[in-house]
Amino acid sequence: WLGPAAEVIEVGQRDDGCLCLAGMEEKGFYMVSAKPILGIFWKHTNEHWDGYFPVKVKTRAWVSEDIIVGQTRETDAVEVACVLEGWNIEKNDWQDVGRYTIPVGENGFFSMTLGSDTAETIDCVVKEVICKNAAGEVIGKDS
């Protein structure tokens, strides 16, 4: 169930076979999962329920298990660069763990599956999102 979403987007597939779906709304999106049943149908599961991601600023992104997801209202954005950071226990401080360039869809939604080495070895958060236009110019930042 994706609530009153006007658009449903397939984001990716989890390692356990669950399909990850996003239901787009005007001010955010839902993330839910579904598993195949009887060969041709999909059944909603609670295995990867992430609930509602409100986007109250121009651009927002999160790490949902092993997938970066986000939405931007920068209408000229064609890609975003997401800078991830994770907690370093040895240094007792946050450190940058990666920078990922992700294409932006017509609806402003963007997503990317992280490599298992990043997703499984460190607890990541999105430190900064940089929006770029077709010319590669920075047109917005959210940090």
Give a label for each model feature.
Residues A22-M24, T72, T113-S116:
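Short beta-strand-to-loop capping motifs
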Residues G3-A6, G39-I40, G51-P54, T59-D66, ...:
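Ser/Thr-rich low-complexity repeats and stalk/linker segments
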